[in-house]
């Protein structure tokens, strides 16, 4: 018999998000949450990444996500993937662009790497908001983020017949980079294959 595969948000999420119905009116406020989640996740033994799904217009938080690769022994459990999975369960659909749902965005403390780029592609999200860049992640942590097309932003924004995904970069980039640097300084695990 094979084990049941379940990803569970850590209990401390409720400390960081005591009011799950709170609205975050600006991109900066939304990114501040993603960065706080990344910081707390490092202290809890996870990877240095945080993410959240929000309704674009209202700023209503739909779902948080943190990197659970090490604590939950699952290379799929990156912060963006966890946030998308939680949002899909909250909304009870695999398609976050389904009729009746407001347009949603993924706010992530760092640019999605190759795996999360694919997850984003199929999620139904309307916008991606990024803190640190790929080169920041690689230089500050030592992770290898894998290959992305040079024109990855253009491919997201224009992808017929699918609707485009808008991209906003460098939101609180300095603060996001500070979290990445702290992970390395604290001896954070490089959980890449063979790492």
Predicted regions and their residues:
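Immediate flanking context of iron-sulfur cluster ligation sites
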Residues: 97-111
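Local cysteine-cluster metal-coordination motifs and their immediate loop/turn environment
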Residues: 73, 107-127
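Short hydrophobic alpha-helix segments
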Residues: 63-65
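Short loop/turn motifs at secondary-structure junctions and domain boundaries
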Residues: 42-46
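Zinc-dependent deaminase
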Residues: 1-40, 102, 119-195
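A short, polar/charged loop-to-alpha-helix boundary motif
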Residues: 68-82
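Short beta-strand scaffold segments in enzyme catalytic cores
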Residues: 49-55
């Amino acid at each position: 018999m094979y084990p049941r595969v379940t990803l569970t948000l850590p209990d401390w999420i409720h400390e960081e998000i005591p009011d799950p119905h709170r609205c975050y009116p600006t991109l900066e406020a939304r990114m501040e949450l993603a960065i706080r989640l990344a910081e707390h996740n490092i202290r809890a033994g996870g990877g240095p990444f945080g993410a959240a799904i929000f309704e674009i217009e209202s700023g209503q938080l739909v779902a948080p996500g943190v990197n659970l690769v090490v604590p939950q022994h699952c290379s799929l459990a990156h912060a963006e993937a966890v946030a998308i999975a939680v949002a899909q369960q909250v909304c009870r659909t695999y398609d976050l662009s389904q009729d009746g749902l407001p347009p949603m965005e993924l706010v992530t403390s760092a640019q999605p790497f190759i795996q999360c780029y694919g997850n984003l592609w199929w999620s139904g999200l309307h916008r991606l908001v990024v803190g640190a860049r790929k080169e920041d992640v690689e230089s500050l942590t030592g992770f290898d983020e894998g290959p992305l097309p040079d024109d990855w932003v253009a491919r997201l924004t224009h992808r017929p017949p699918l609707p485009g995904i808008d991209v906003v970069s460098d939101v609180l980039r300095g603060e996001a980079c500070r979290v990445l640097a702290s992970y390395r300084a604290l001896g954070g695990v490089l959980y890449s294959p063979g790492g």
